[in-house]
């Protein structure tokens, strides 16, 4: 703290008469000293300040230019992405429509093939029934024929005596004899 107050005391100290120096006491400086200091600052600082401002201006302009280029690139990428999105959506719609029509086509094919299979099964069933009916009819005919034959044989055996039997044989032999004479 003491150093701080000492520095204010030294600022208030005037240089001795006859010497040239700057008054470091800001409150006690006169306008001539201030104008000299400002003149030196303006003269030498003007170029530095202009260079600093020009550099800053160039950096800002470059940044704006780069930002504009990046913005243009981003807009172009956005447009490309939108175009790809529209293309993908169109293709998805095509696939969706084709998929639905493919499903409907497959469903129709399945219904048609099922109908054909059912029709074939119906035909096989009818053929099997017809075959079984024919087989049953043939079996019944065969049994009826066997029973009729057995009945006829039984009737013949009961009706025929040896004498009748011999006459029938002789009559048949006679018929064969006349047939032979006719054919010769």
Curated annotation (Swiss-Prot):
Is the keyword ATP-binding in the record? no
What membrane topology term does the record carry?
A: Single-pass membrane protein
The UniProt keyword set, sorted, is: ATP synthesis, CF(0), Chloroplast, Hydrogen ion transport, Ion transport, Membrane, Plastid, Thylakoid, Transmembrane, Transmembrane helix, Transport
Note the InterPro entries from the entry.
ATP_synth_b/b'su_bac/chlpt
Query: From which residue to which does the signal peptide run?
Result: none
Entry's transmembrane regions: 27-49
**Top-level taxon in the UniProt lineage:** Eukaryota
One term of GO molecular function: proton-transporting ATP synthase activity, rotational mechanism
GO cellular component annotations of the record: chloroplast thylakoid membrane; proton-transporting ATP synthase complex
Keyword Transmembrane helix tagged: yes
Q: Where found in the cell? A: Plastid, Chloroplast thylakoid membrane
Q: Which Pfam families match?
A: ATP-synt_B (PF00430)
- Family assignment from sequence similarity: Belongs to the ATPase B chain family.
Chain's role:
F(1)F(0) ATP synthase produces ATP from ADP in the presence of a proton or sodium gradient. F-type ATPases consist of two structural domains, F(1) containing the extramembraneous catalytic core and F(0) containing the membrane proton channel, linked together by a central stalk and a peripheral stalk. During catalysis, ATP synthesis in the catalytic domain of F(1) is coupled via a rotary mechanism of the central stalk subunits to proton translocation. Component of the F(0) channel, it forms part of the peripheral stalk, linking F(1) to F(0).
Quote the record's miscellaneous comment: In plastids the F-type ATPase is also known as CF(1)CF(0).
Q: Assembly state and interactors?
A: F-type ATPases have 2 components, F(1) - the catalytic core - and F(0) - the membrane proton channel. F(1) has five subunits: alpha(3), beta(3), gamma(1), delta(1), epsilon(1). F(0) has four main subunits: a(1), b(1), b'(1) and c(10-14). The alpha and beta chains form an alternating ring which encloses part of the gamma chain. F(1) is attached to F(0) by a central stalk formed by the gamma and epsilon chains, while a peripheral stalk is formed by the delta, b and b' chains.
- What this protein is called in its record is ATP synthase subunit b, chloroplastic
- Organism equals Capsella bursa-pastoris
* Highest classification ranks of the organism: Eukaryota, Viridiplantae, Streptophyta, Embryophyta, Tracheophyta
